[in-house]
Amino acid sequence: MKKNKDVLLKNKILKKLNIINIKNLDNIKEKLKKPDWIKIKIPVNTSRIYQIKNALRKNNLYSVCEEAHCPNLSECFNNGTATFMILGSICTRNCPFCAVFHGRPNPVNVEEPQKLSDTIFDMGINYVVITSVVRDDLYDGGAEHFVNCIKAIKNKNQVKIEILVPDFRGRIELILNIFNNALPDIFNHNIENVPRLYKKIRPGANYQRSLLLLESFKKKYCSVLTKSGLMLGLGEKDVEIIQVMKDLYSSGVTLLTVGQYLQPSIHHLPVKRYIPLSEFENIKKEALSIGFTNAFCGPFVRSSYHASFQSHLPIKNNDINNI
C-alpha cells in the first residue's frame, strides 16, 4: 500500500515538473535589433563584484541577479547590493521567459537561513531582497523557509526586508498563517504580464490567483507594503497594461515596477517590441493617476532594482534613465 502511495506521489511531482510545454518558440521571426536606449555601459569595480560573488559562493548562496541574467547585475554588485535567491537554484516550473534553471530541485537546506543572515551581516547592507525559485514540490511552496530566513536575518541585522515570492500554488490560507510568525517590510509578488498572455508566458500560473494572493496578504497584514511588477514587450496592448495596473491597485498594491522584457537566450521567448522611453514615462504617469504611491518604470527596471529607494522615497520627476 505504501509503495503505491509513493508511486502516486512520485508521478504527481513528475507531472508538476512537466506541466511546461514550450510551444511558444515555434515560428520565431528574425530577432529584433536592440535600440540605442537598451545598450548601456556602466563603470564597474570588478574587485567589488568578485568580492560579493565570493561571499555568495563561500556560503553556498545564490543571487537572482546571476541566475536570471539580470541586466543590472554589474551596477548592483558594484554598489554592494544583491537580491538573494533561497530554496536552491532549480525551479519546478519552466516559464519560457526566465533564465533560471528548471528541473527536480534539491532538498531544502535548513542551514541556509543562518548562512544568509551571516552573509548579510558581513556585507554590511541595510536593505535585503529575498526571492526564491518556485517550489511546487513543497507542501507550503517554501513559505516556512521564507519565514525562517526573515527570523534569522532580524536576529542579527538591523535591516529592512523585502520578499519577492512565488504564488505558492494558491495555498493562500496556509501561507498567511505561516507568515504570521515573521513578517517582511515589503511583500512583493510579480503579476508579470497581462492575463491574455498567461498560458504562453506563465504556464502553471494563474492571473486571478496572483491577484488574490496580493489582496489576501494586504488584508491580513495591512501594515506591510505590497508590491508587484510587469515586464513588457511580449505582445501586450496598452489597454491591457492599464487594466492590470487597475487590478493590482484594487488588490491593495501601492508599489509598482514596470520594465522591458529582454530575451535571455535564443531558447527563450523572443522580444516582440522594445518599449520607447516616452511610453514608459506615460505608463508611470498613468500608474500615479490610478493611485500608486510609487512607480518605477523604465527599460532596465526590475523588481528589486533600487528597491531600497522605492521602499521609502516619494515619487519624484526623475529622468527615467536614472531609475
From Swiss-Prot:
InterPro entries named among the record's database cross-references: Aldolase_TIM (IPR013785), Elp3/MiaA/NifB-like_rSAM (IPR006638), LIAS_N (IPR031691), Lipoyl_synth (IPR003698), rSAM (IPR007197)
Keyword Cytoplasm: yes
GO MF terms, alphabetically ordered: 4 iron, 4 sulfur cluster binding; lipoate synthase activity; metal ion binding
Cofactor descriptive note: Binds 2 [4Fe-4S] clusters per subunit. One cluster is coordinated with 3 cysteines and an exchangeable S-adenosyl-L-methionine.
Subcellular location: Cytoplasm
Binding-site positions, [4Fe-4S] cluster 2: 91, 95, 98
EC numbers for this chain: 2.8.1.8
Ribonucleoprotein listed as a keyword: no
Keywords: 4Fe-4S, Cytoplasm, Iron, Iron-sulfur, Metal-binding, S-adenosyl-L-methionine, Transferase
UniProt record similarity statement: Belongs to the radical SAM superfamily. Lipoyl synthase family.
Protein name: Lipoyl synthase
